[in-house]
Amino acid sequence: MNTAMFKDNRYLDLKNIVPVDLCRIVTKYALLKEETEFSPELGNNAQVENAHSVYSDTLMETMLHFLLPHIEKNTGLSLCPTYTYYRVYRPGMVLDRHKDRPSCEISTTVCFGFNYTNVSSDYKWGMYVEPGNLITQNPGDIIIYRGCEVEHWRDSFSAGSESYQVQAFFHYIDKNGPFYPEYAYDKRPGIGYQLNKMHK
């Protein structure tokens, strides 16, 4: 059923895929990295200005393999991993409407954790997918989407100061598609290599 939905809609909203305890660990990890090894997006390559963002983090690259069978099962595709990218969103940040580059043919965004202040108890900061469907997530939920085809974006993060949301992006290409093998591992020797850090 999910494979048919993905084929028709070009995205899937899946709940409770990543274990909650693992989500807590990743969230604490990302926040600690933000505090001790701050890596902001800056300049012309910035997609979310000043957000702590990391390409090819070793923990995330490990999870790229963990998620692979889930993504293949729900899309019906045979996939090759390309790369990962995680980001800590803070109040006022916006993700502009966009499509992704070839290495993001099949993309997955995972919500690992959040903390909201000065908002209503039912507030959730979600992602829009073309044509304008808002998807909200709890920790462990994932959205699979065709990153090169489906526009996606986030409105301004309107929660209060000290709020955060930790999201990570796990990218793959179809082994039977137009971007394989050229974009395998995002043109790196393999998963985990810290190359092309400016890519998103």
Regions found by a protein language model. Give the residues of each.
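Catalytic core of non-heme Fe(II) oxygenases with the double-stranded beta-helix
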Residues: 91-153, 161-168, 173-188
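Acyl-donor (CoA/ACP) binding surface of acyl/acetyltransferases
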Residues: 158
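A short coil-to-beta-strand element that immediately follows conserved catalytic motifs
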Residues: 76-85
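Conserved active-site beta-strand element of glycosyltransferases/polysaccharide synthases
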Residues: 88
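Generic beta-strand or strand-like secondary-structure segments
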Residues: 66-70, 85, 107, 111
